[in-house]
Amino acid sequence: MPASISRSTYASMFGPTTGDRLRLGDTELVIEVERDLTTYGEEVKFGGGKVIRDGMGQSQRTRAEGAMDTVITNALIVDWTGIYKADVGLRDGRIAKIGKAGNPDTQPGVDIVIGPGTEIIAGEGRILTAGGMDAHIHFICPQQIEDSLHSGITTMLGGGTGPAHGTLATTCTPGPWHIGRMLQAADAFPINLAFAGKGNASLPAGLEEQVRAGASCLKLHEDWGTTPAAIDCCLSVADRMDVQVMIHTDTLNESGFVENTLAAIGGRTIHAFHTEGAGGGHAPDIIKVVGAANVIPSSTNPTMPYTANTVEEHLDMLMVCHHLDRSIPEDVAFAESRIRKETIAAEDILHDMGAFSVISSDSQAMGRVGEVITRTWQTAHKMKVQRGRLAEETGANDNQRVRRYIAKYTINPAIAHGLSRHIGSVEEGKRADLVLWQPAFFGAKPDLVLLGGMIVCAQMGDPNGSIPAQPYYSRPMFGAFGGALHASAVTFVSQAAEEDGVGERLRLQKGTLAVEGTRDIGKADMKLNAHRPSIEVNPETYEVRADGELLTCQPLAELPLAQRYFLY
């Protein structure tokens, strides 16, 4: 006879199932399980007296016969594709199958085979997401990578050479020599990396050599002169060599206004950094570009979300990051022109509408590398509190909003930079760059981070304890060491560099993967974040209107996922 148990008992044993709801961290965001790919009564679970034992949930099948390397059991997947429960099978560092795990010789409907060679990660009661991607990195110091990885980011893209003054201000790794050295340095780190060359030039040769050397993209930055000629030259090279271009436009409007920049771009695909403008760009109306079909607009996290302290801290940040001097009136005026509470407030709302597509950090250059994920969910919380449920929500949940916001640091930056065949979502065939969270700590502290199917960091207690005892904090794991590091992580390069054998030429120990498909995309390709409102900015009051509607909201004085989570 079938047995019946209460929902609460079931959830405590196997995790939530279809129709169950749970809160994310201490936010006001509530998700509901949309479907469950496991089978009631045939769930697999590891442990003493549990299902995954020889002849029961574990089959006799070898790896050659299809058994998985690792199975994550009963996980609640939170992804742009949906919010659902499933077992996840990993093989060769990729997601082989999402469905029902077990022993096909004793259980029905099994499409993920557990064998003697299969490791188990218990996903019951945990949330599984894709590893995050931070697409705006100043590689100022290598210690950033640890902070980023332990926050749930598994891919970092940007430029720099260390604390050189060019890197302190701009996300560029300039020239073939520096690109080669940074590609070699990447071998030391348990994270996927990609480097941006300097895109500011009026003739193509200096840009082409950087792409051939291994730059996966090119960065136009106003501190190097983002003129119409440089924009056109850079995009022409990118179109020929299939790499993305990121742009930090001309705050001072010296070489033109936002309309001139859009004319120079000429309808070609471009990723616009900190499109609100506090991080830099045409003052006061760079935010207009969110309405362009060819522009992928992103935010950096210091303005996300708008709080009581946002404006005050920005002036000091800006003076330091852009090598400005408080004793020079022009430098102070430059800084003040970029910090506008009206456009910062509008940015939150435009994210909630799906008009901004990406969130990134701007690490140590007006951004916090370990807070991309936290600030994304703080913004989603703020908008839920201030704007209520999205009109498109169904049921007593925030699933649509949650799917929209998770896309901003997973699939959308991956699409923008030609990496979505490999990363960006929990889908079969993609790299097993995955993050497991306890729901109470979601967005603040990951439980486990996997890179290429190997655990690279995790919450861990006292190594000398008889059991892993408190205090728990995030520590590197075996996947972050030795040859496992090189087998788990990859470095993304241009197709030209991949075809030229950059890995062999530089004797790289990590594998390399080529970016692809960066030029035939646009705003419409941004998952759940493709809205294109017509934006107007009042040049005197800085008020922002979208399709005629005034966009304004109040700063919050208190946020979730904050001090109560970070005692140590």
Swiss-Prot record:
Binds 2 nickel ions per subunit. The keyword Transcription does not apply. HAMAP family: Urease_alpha. Residues 131-568 form the Urease domain. Its cofactor is Ni cation. The active site is at H322 (proton donor). One of its GO terms (molecular function) is urease activity. It comes from Cereibacter sphaeroides (strain ATCC 17029 / ATH 2.4.9). The modification N6-carboxylysine is found at K219. It catalyses: urea + 2 H2O + H(+) = hydrogencarbonate + 2 NH4(+). It is found in: Cytoplasm. PROSITE patterns: UREASE_1, UREASE_2, UREASE_3. Pfam families: Amidohydro_1, Urease_alpha. It is an enzyme of class 3 (hydrolase). Heterotrimer of UreA (gamma), UreB (beta) and UreC (alpha) subunits. Three heterotrimers associate to form the active enzyme. It comes from the Bacteria. The keyword Methyltransferase does not apply. Its EC number is 3.5.1.5. Keywords: Cytoplasm, Hydrolase, Metal-binding, Nickel. Substrate binds at H221. Pathway: Nitrogen metabolism; urea degradation; CO(2) and NH(3) from urea (urease route): step 1/1. Ni(2+) 2 binds at K219, H248, H274. Belongs to the metallo-dependent hydrolases superfamily. Urease alpha subunit family. The lineage of its organism: Bacteria, Pseudomonadati, Pseudomonadota, Alphaproteobacteria, Rhodobacterales. Carboxylation allows a single lysine to coordinate two nickel ions. This is Urease subunit alpha. Ni(2+) 1 binds at H136, H138, K219, D362.
